[in-house]
Amino acid sequence: MFKINLGDFMLIRPRRLRKNQKIRDLVRETILTKNDLIMPIFVDENLKGNEKKEISSMPNQYRFSVEGAIEEAKEIADLGIPAVILFGIPKHKDEIASSAYDKNGVVQRTIRGIKEELGDELLVIADCCLCEYTSHGHCGIVKDGKILNDATLPILAKIALSYADAGVDIVAPSDMMDGRVRAIREILEENGYDDVAIMSYSAKYASSFYGPFREAAESAPKFGDRKSYQMDIGNAREALKEIALDIEEGADLILVKPALPYLDIIRMAKDRFDVPIGGYCVSGEYAMVEAAARNGWLDREKVIYEILLSIKRAGADFIITYWAKEVAEIGLSQE
């Protein structure tokens, strides 16, 4: 009789579940789909008609006119991507970011145009900040070289209200002022916009990965830096405190920015909080991959897929990425 000696072979061989693509697909733990993605759109008030302008540090990414942004949103919706996030570049900048809450501002007109064309077929998120609209490029009111927290809150609230008046689905404060979520939630409730959600950039780090975005949005600070309000890159527990405060103040969704260097923060937040959590795959991450790919140093499509999958695997429920259209159009795979 044949006898099995358990010492002669391995009972557990993880490679059995890797031997071909079908079995790998069957047991894959994390799957990336277009429903996970949000596409950014830069809307430039200085552009007319269907004019668009390529962003030099972000190949294949553009600033659009209002009309062009509406057409771009229609293309995005047709691809099955569920949401866009809008960033505005105004004609006029001043010390108090007055163009940011103008009812006929560049973002407000774009929101109305998208909603008139698409209704609920596409979620419209609007970034809520001052930096693109201030003459000094900071995310708050400045006095004597200091960024004032409490003086900034009413302006952020006015911006959010103007977006809600235009028909936005979600407002996304990215300024990192203390108390901004409460200020926004209160003004929305007072004006009957209880169904407008807040996606707070709760853990937004003072990162070096934002450089290309600041060119795209013309939002670089004219003096100093943003380290007095954006988070220190070495801190993790502080991120959890920021997230907890924003949820307590009324945030419906929270965002970690950047995503790839802060996957640990996404994972910690996912384990701790019961709200949808997103990661922003930022301009520097995009530019880094595109530059390396142009030099033939890596397999572009596989790297994009791996980056986005890693963000989801870390715990992100949604991902803001400049590759959203491409992923939806052609699909990407690790194989």
From Swiss-Prot:
UniProt binding sites for 5-aminolevulinate 1: 214, 226
Key word Lyase present: yes
Catalytic activity from the UniProt record: 2 5-aminolevulinate = porphobilinogen + 2 H2O + H(+)
Q: Where, in this chain's numbering, is Zn(2+) bound?
A: 129, 131, 139
The GO cellular component terms are: cytosol
Q: What molecular function terms (GO) are annotated for this protein?
A: porphobilinogen synthase activity; zinc ion binding
The record's CDD domains line, in alphabetical order, gives: ALAD_PBGS
Q: Report keywords, A-Z.
A: Heme biosynthesis, Lyase, Magnesium, Metal-binding, Porphyrin biosynthesis, Zinc
Which annotated residues bind Mg(2+)?
242
Q: Which InterPro entries match?
A: ALAD, ALAD_AS, Aldolase_TIM
Pathway(s) annotated for this protein in UniProt:
Porphyrin-containing compound metabolism; protoporphyrin-IX biosynthesis; coproporphyrinogen-III from 5-aminolevulinate: step 1/4
Cofactor: record remark: Binds 1 zinc ion per monomer.
Q: Does the keyword Transferase apply?
A: no
Q: Where is the active site?
A: 204, 257
Q: Which residues cross the membrane?
A: none
List required co-factors: Zn(2+)
Q: Which residues bind 5-aminolevulinate 2?
A: 283, 322
Q: What is its EC number?
A: 4.2.1.24
Which Pfam family name is an example for this entry?
ALAD
* Quaternary state and interactors: Homooctamer.
Q: What does this protein do?
A: Catalyzes an early step in the biosynthesis of tetrapyrroles. Binds two molecules of 5-aminolevulinate per subunit, each at a distinct site, and catalyzes their condensation to form porphobilinogen.
**What family is it from?**
Belongs to the ALAD family.
| Name by which UniProt lists this protein | Delta-aminolevulinic acid dehydratase
What is the organism of origin for this protein?
Answer: Methanocaldococcus jannaschii (strain ATCC 43067 / DSM 2661 / JAL-1 / JCM 10045 / NBRC 100440) (Methanococcus jannaschii)
Its lineage reads:
Archaea, Methanobacteriati, Methanobacteriota, Methanomada group, Methanococci
